[in-house]
């Protein structure tokens, strides 16, 4: 007897396992396992084992569907199918639980591979530390101004990010539900039919799962996109806020610079105080064409003579850009040397310190100097007279101020400006002609003395040699190349060159390699002079060699010159200050001494007050001037292209149709543009009117150029709102579509508007006719005027055409050809030769006058026609369609003026005020613009007084500190 539980179990297994897990094949039944035969054959009452062999579908069972080889025991009970507990679910769970080991191993291996890949990529990236000099100075200080707490608060919360992650609880519930489906057991007939259903049900389940997965993925993508947009908007707002704060901080810094607000006072060294005075004097000299006589060390020499190398040895750092044979020093470089605990360099206008002990900082400093030099050179020039100020501090550095000048050249090569040689000579002379300047003359010892150019220049500027120090460079090459060592002795004794000097020095500034360090150059220099025959044979004295002795001698000479001349310079500036103050008191006794920046701030406030006055214009004034200007702009088009052509028709319906078509075309194409042009011109005129009215109230005329420039630039930048034209077109179209005049006052206003317009046109037409026919008999007798032959011909033509109009008062606007011929023949009969073109031209003006006179009579009749219009009576004499047309035009003008007034007061005036503020800010940051717009002797005198006072105060402070040091 077959067991029902086994049959049910097999059917359940076949339903759970897809068909692809086994390959169907046909085998004889007797070759199957006895249990398989029991499963694959239906139960029958007779237990006959003898059955004919037949083919049956069999499967290769996997480990998930393994069945016991021993036949299961039957339960106690009757016949039929019996439930049988199986352990296939437990086996399935055991197989699934093995996945955790696979996942854990994959995670560990994947993490290791990812880390290894990241390290490989990181090694392939270039070292960006060498390019830190590209980043501007303010970026390094940005971290001090950024509030990290605010940035952290602006980032998404952890809970919001967690919402975007997959819901693990839902995944667990789905897995439990799937497990329950797999573990459920079916009974009865439905269980037996299960093998026939699985393909369709499985397909439906798979499609449902895929659809659910697609929908969930789509929801996740939408959530991620929304979160990305929210984050983007949040950072955009942060960026806008930071830009606004940066702009405000920049404005505060500019105001501090302009108003002279100083930071906390820091005690400065003596040399720093002196260098600051020289910087102020340098600006004062370049702006006012004056020369100070304060001492400084001027380094001059031929190109590639070693000037820069000598200066670097004194500064103990390779701070200047180098080039093999080409010009590298393109502008004067003022170097303030002082002693300090750390070897650093800093520009005058920057707070960044360059650590001269680090090679990357040295490279950045050299690059910055080269950039500043190239920036100072104007287009089409090779060198610049602008000075670059640099301070160098370090242990063992002698205190002094040196100025490195461009090397003197003998020939202008390709790529240089034609006046390069003369410019270098003029710059060198400007520094050397200072009677207190110390000239450090650098001469290349490896070239012939006869090729020297700078020695002649120095001998011209200091013929007695009282402030010149001669330096012979590249002595090692000179000793090696020169056959006669006595020639070097003649140079350092001052016998070879036609110049005199306070002292003569011989130095070695390295082997010529740009990569040599200062220490290696010093060692090489000391070794050379210790082993040199020049020193051993007595040709050179010990105090005349090495850059160390040179720097000590130059420093002593510098400070000696400073002590002797600084008080004299202070007295000179004191006298200059007295002269300037006296001139101010005599010429401007009741005015405060305001420099250019202070005057600009005053003018800025006045201009902003004038702009604010625009908001005080009354709406009635805006609308009246807008309506008046708009009608002046469009009246010709309305009369000539709309009213006159439509009025020639004799039918009321044709008149209205023509008017509607022409009004629609006019509204779609021209009218909105004309209206915006009128509004823009009105805004400009009102702005100019307020500035002119404000000018009369004790305004300083020194601001006229500035105010005019601000007004022009603001108007140039102002653009009308683009959406205004579309809305205005709709409003105008709706206003012109309305034909219903509701009350008598509107009717009377339209008639008055029409009469004024027609009378104005009639007056213009009569003036044209009077010019055509010349003076009448009264003017000829009273004013002694005569008609020209053409005027006489036109007068005869006019008289003939007037007769025609009297006969045909309802004549059309154009003459027929036979009528032209008749008029011409009548005139010829009276001896007047006339051209047909002249006849038509005269007819046009006469008919125009005739038509306008008739229209005025009709307009007068329509004064009593409102009742007929309101009741829609049909009366040919009182068809006042032209009155309705003028009412539509008048109403459109009023509505347009009201709309434009709202746009002006609500939007455009504020936008114009914003433009004015931006223009004022831009002009305030442009010093050249301020110098160009605020000019005059009064401004110049105030600027001179401010500078001279500042120089005198700093000189007195320096002299006081100098006396204390003594």
Swiss-Prot record:
Residues 213-259, 901-966 form a coiled coil. Residues 742-862 are annotated as: Paddle region. Residues 595-842, 880-934 are annotated as: Stalk region. It comes from Danio rerio (Zebrafish). Dynamin-related GTPase that is essential for normal mitochondrial morphology by mediating fusion of the mitochondrial inner membranes, regulating cristae morphology and maintaining respiratory chain function. Exists in two forms: the transmembrane, long form (Dynamin-like GTPase OPA1, long form; L-OPA1), which is tethered to the inner mitochondrial membrane, and the short soluble form (Dynamin-like GTPase OPA1, short form; S-OPA1), which results from proteolytic cleavage and localizes in the intermembrane space. Its EC number is 3.6.5.5. One of its GO terms (molecular function) is phosphatidic acid binding. CDD domains: DLP_1 (cd08771). Residues 291-567 form the Dynamin-type G domain. Residues 301-308 are annotated as: G1 motif. GO terms for cellular component: cytoplasm; microtubule; mitochondrial inner membrane; mitochondrial intermembrane space; mitochondrial membrane. GO terms for biological process: apoptotic process; chordate embryonic development; endocytosis; GTP metabolic process; intracellular distribution of mitochondria; membrane tubulation; mitochondrial fission; mitochondrial fusion. Residues 207-217 have a biased composition (Basic and acidic residues). Residues 327-330 are annotated as: G2 motif. Cleaved by OMA1 or YME1L downstream of the transmembrane region in response to different signals to generate soluble forms. Cleaved by OMA1 at position S1 following stress conditions, generating the short soluble form (Dynamin-like GTPase OPA1, short form; S-OPA1). Residues 113-776, 788-966 are mitochondrial intermembrane. This is Dynamin-like GTPase OPA1, mitochondrial. Residues 404-407 are annotated as: G3 motif. Residues 87-95 are mitochondrial matrix. The chain crosses the membrane at residues 96-112. Residues 473-476 are annotated as: G4 motif.
């Amino acid at each position: 007897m077959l067991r029902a539980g086994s049959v049910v179990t097999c059917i359940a297994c076949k339903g759970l396992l897809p068909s692809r897990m086994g390959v169907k094949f046909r085998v004889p039944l007797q070759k199957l396992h006895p249990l398989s035969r029991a499963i694959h054959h239906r139960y029958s009452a007779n237990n006959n084992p003898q059955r004919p062999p037949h083919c049956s579908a069999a499967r290769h069972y996997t480990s998930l569907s393994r069945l016991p080889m021993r036949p299961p025991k039957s339960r106690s009970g009757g016949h039929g199918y019996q439930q049988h507990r199986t352990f296939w679910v437990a086996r399935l769970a055991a197989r699934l639980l093995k996945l955790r080991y696979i996942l854990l191993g994959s995670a560990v291996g994947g993490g290791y591979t990812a880390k290894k890949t990241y390290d490989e990529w990181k090694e392939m990236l270039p070292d960006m530390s060498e390019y830190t000099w590209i980043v501007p100075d303010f970026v390094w200080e940005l971290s001090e101004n950024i509030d990290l707490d605010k940035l952290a608060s602006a980032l998404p919360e952890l809970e919001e990010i967690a919402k975007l992650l997959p819901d693990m609880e839902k995944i667990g519930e789905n897995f439990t539900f799937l497990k329950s489906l797999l573990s459920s057991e079916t009974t009865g007939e439905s269980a037996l039919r299960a093998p026939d259903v699985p393909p369709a049900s499985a397909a439906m389940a798979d499609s449902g799962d895929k659809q659910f997965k697609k929908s969930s993925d789509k929801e996740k993508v939408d959530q991620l996109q929304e979160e990305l947009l929210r984050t983007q908007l949040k950072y955009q707002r942060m960026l806008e806020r930071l830009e606004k704060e940066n702009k405000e901080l920049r404005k505060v810094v500019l105001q501090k610079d302009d108003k002279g607000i100083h930071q906390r006072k820091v005690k400065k060294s003596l040399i720093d105080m002196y260098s600051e005075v020289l910087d102020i004097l340098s600006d004062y000299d370049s702006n006012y064409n004056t020369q100070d006589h304060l001492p400084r060390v001027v380094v001059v020499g031929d190109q590639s003579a070693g000037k820069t190398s000598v200066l670097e040895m004194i500064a103990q750092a390779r701070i200047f850009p180098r080039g093999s044979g080409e010009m590298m020093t393109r502008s004067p470089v003022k170097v303030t040397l002082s002693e300090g605990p750390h070897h650093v360099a800093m520009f005058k206008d920057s707070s960044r310190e360059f650590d001269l002990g680090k090679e990357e900082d040295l490279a950045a400093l050299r690059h910055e100097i080269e950039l500043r030099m190239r920036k100072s050179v104007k287009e089409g020039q090779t060198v610049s007279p602008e000075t670059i100020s640099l301070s160098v501090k370090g242990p063992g550095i002698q205190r002094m101020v040196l100025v490195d000048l461009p090397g003197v050249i003998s020939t202008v090569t390709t790529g240089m400006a034609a006046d390069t040689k003369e410019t270098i000579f003029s710059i060198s002379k400007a520094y050397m002609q200072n009677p207190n300047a110390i000239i450090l003359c650098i001469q290349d010892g490896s070239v012939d003395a006869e090729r020297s150019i700078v020695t002649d220049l120095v001998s011209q500027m200091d013929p007695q040699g009282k402030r010149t120090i001669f330096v012979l460079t590249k002595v090692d090459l000179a000793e090696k190349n020169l056959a006669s060592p006595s020639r070097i002795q003649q140079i350092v004794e001052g016998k070879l060159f036609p110049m005199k000097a306070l002292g003569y020095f011989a130095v070695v500034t390295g082997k010529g390699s740009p990569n040599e360090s200062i220490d290696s150059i010093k060692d090489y220099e000391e070794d050379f002079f210790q082993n040199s025959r020049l020193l051993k044979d007595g040709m050179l004295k010990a105090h005349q060699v090495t850059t160390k002795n040179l720097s000590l001698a130059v420093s002593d000479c510098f400070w000696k010159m400073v002590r002797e001349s600084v008080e004299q310079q202070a007295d000179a500036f004191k006298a200059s200050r007295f002269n300037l103050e006296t001139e101010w008191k005599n010429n401007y006794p009741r005015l405060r001494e305001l420099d250019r920046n202070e005057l600009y701030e005053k003018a800025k406030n006045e201009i902003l007050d004038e702009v604010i006055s625009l908001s005080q214009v009354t709406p009635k004034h805006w609308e009246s001037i807008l309506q008046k200007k708009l009608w002046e702009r469009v009246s010709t088009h309305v009369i000539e292209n709309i009213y006159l052509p439509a009025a020639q028709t004799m039918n009321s319906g044709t008149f209205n149709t023509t008017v509607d078509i022409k009004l629609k075309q006019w509204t779609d194409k021209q009218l909105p543009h004309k209206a915006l042009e009128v509004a823009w011109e009105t805004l400009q005129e009102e702005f100019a009117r307020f500035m002119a009215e404000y000018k009369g109230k004790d305004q300083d005329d020194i601001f006229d150029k500035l105010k005019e420039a601000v007004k022009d630039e603001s108007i140039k930048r102002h653009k009308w709102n683009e959406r205004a034209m579309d809305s205005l077109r709709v409003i105008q179209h709706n206003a012109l579509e309305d034909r219903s005049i509701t009350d008598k006052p509107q009717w009377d206003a339209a008639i008055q508007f029409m009469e004024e317009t027609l009378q104005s046109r009639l007056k213009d037409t009569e003036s044209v006719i009077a010019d055509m026919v010349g003076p009448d008999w009264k003017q000829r007798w009273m004013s002694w005027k005569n008609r020209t032959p053409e005027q006489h011909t036109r007068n005869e033509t006019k008289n003939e055409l007037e007769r025609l109009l009297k006969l045909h008062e309802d004549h059309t606007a154009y003459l027929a050809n036979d009528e032209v011929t008749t008029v011409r023949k009548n005139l010829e009969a009276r001896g007047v030769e006339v051209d047909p073109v002249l006849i038509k031209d005269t007819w046009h003006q006469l008919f125009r006058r005739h038509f306008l006179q008739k229209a005025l009579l009709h307009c007068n009749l329509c004064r009593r026609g409102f009742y007929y219009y309101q009741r829609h009576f049909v009366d040919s004499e009182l068809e006042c369609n032209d009155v309705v047309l003028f009412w539509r035009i008048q109403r459109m003008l009023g509505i347009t003026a009201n709309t434009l007034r709202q746009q002006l007061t609500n939007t455009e005036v504020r936008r114009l005020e914003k433009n004015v503020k931006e223009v004022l800010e831009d002009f305030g940051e442009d010093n050249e613009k301020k110098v160009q717009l605020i000019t005059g002797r009064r401004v110049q005198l105030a600027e001179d007084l401010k500078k001279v006072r500042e120089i005198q105060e700093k000189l007195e402070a320096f002299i006081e500190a100098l006396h204390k040091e003594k």
